[in-house]
């Protein structure tokens, strides 16, 4: 909600600061956290989530602001990357499973902020026409954070690299494997 005076904001149980941008990142993040909190509640209510795991999840939520802050520390490599690829007119995001939802949000944010044409595609659908859109030098942001589909995502990365895309990989902290397959 962009303006705190809106009826929806006044009637909501969630209170977050007004969004001061086109890309509604606070609202998106708040929705994710609210959904996670609800899932924890339901998991405990029906006995499918033990107290130890629930506590671990809640601690993780509490640590989110600090983690997000470290992600956005801009270093020289990121600045150089932005200068080199910021002029591109197209970008593609790839993800599987939960990463596909994040890829869709990433594409939306890139469109909203930079006015660069950006689309997100499910990795499993890559061969169904999407691959034809990939051409030399086009940036492809590949999300590979889900262990159960990691190998399939690496296969997708190889496919777009074969078409000479520039692949930016996003993986889990400490994941050395994805770095072997991406350009950045």
Kindly label every feature range from the protein language model.
Residues 84-87, 133-136, 161-164, 177-181:
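A structural signal for short secondary-structure junctions
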Residues 96, 145, 172:
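Cofactor-binding loop segments of dinucleotide-utilizing enzymes, especially the Rossmann-like FAD-
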Residues 169-177:
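Short, polar loop motifs at secondary-structure junctions
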Residues 125-159:
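Glycine-rich, anion-gripping cofactor-binding loops and their flanking helix/strand elements
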Residues 105-113, 155-162, 184:
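Short, solvent-exposed amphipathic alpha-helical segments in soluble enzyme
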Residues 12-15, 178-184:
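Active-site regions of enzymes building and remodeling cell-envelope glycoconjugates
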Residues 1-11:
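Short, small-residue-biased leader/transition segments that mark boundaries at the very start
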Residues 12-139:
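Active-site phosphate/pyrophosphate-binding segments
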